[in-house]
């Protein structure tokens, strides 16, 4: 059960920003300094199909509260059809964003760093090889 009564849309909204900032920071720290390359790389990390794939790494290690946030985000009604993802991918991606929104709003910043590392470590390694 969630400690706070946020709705899925609210958790998705803030979680999107949390993930975006964490990815941008990680890319800069990896040595990419050109803003065009940073934007292109960040987009690959935060698009719905990618988030849908990487959240699968997180599901087995989520706490009950994180899992509740995931389900809350994943299950909220989608208005319209997502442009660059299937409805299932979009739902899983918004569920992932809800996890990070929940963690941010409850002050669990170390857990955010750990889950970002777990979710994106393979992609970060590939990115480092291209620098």
PLM regions: where:
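Double-stranded RNA-binding/processing signature
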Residues: 1-131
